[in-house]
Amino acid sequence: MSRYQCPDCQYIYDENKGEPHEGFHPNTSWNDIPKDWACPDCAVRDKVDFIFLADSPSKETQLGVNSQLANSESGISDATPTGMAVLAAELVIPLNQENKNEGCAAKTEVLDQASTPQVVRKSSTRKKMRNK
């Protein structure tokens, strides 16, 4: 079954779901919808303006994804975008925390070393010039 999207409001007609409010039962083919049918959200009149998106996932595909999720330890398959994001976050967050702690200590030391001697040098230079 296929899906079609309205170009104005992005409403999606899914043949698997149909549009019960419009009188189209689930599994109503796009070809069975009258040509003068209007988008239920924004009333675009021309059915031909709708954009073909793709075939809807079949029940077999959905079952395959569900079993893949059930078999993974975390409940999120590593092959999905969400799974990849979770993996990346697990790797990056500890590194960032270590770098932040090291960076703060290093910056504090540099500031302490740079600011204190400069003040002393300027004041000692002024004192020497006054004494002459």
UniProtKB/Swiss-Prot annotation:
InterPro entries registered for this protein in UniProt: Rubredoxin-like_dom (IPR024934), Rubredoxin_dom (IPR024935), Rubredoxin_ET (IPR050526), Rubredoxin_Fe_BS (IPR018527)
Subcellular location: Cytoplasm
Record pathway: Hydrocarbon metabolism; alkane degradation
Positions of the UniProt region annotated as Disordered: 108-132
Keyword field: Cytoplasm, Electron transport, Iron, Metal-binding, Plasmid, Transport
GO MF: electron transfer activity; iron ion binding
Record: residues binding Fe cation: C6, C9, C39, C42
Single GO biological process annotation from the record: alkane catabolic process
A family per Pfam: Rubredoxin
Record's function text: Not known. Probably involved in an electron transport pathway, but not required for the hydrocarbon hydroxylating system. Seems to be non-functional.
PANTHER family hit by this protein: RUBREDOXIN (PTHR47627), RUBREDOXIN-1-RELATED (PTHR47627:SF1)
Protein's UniProt name: Rubredoxin-1
Gene: alkF
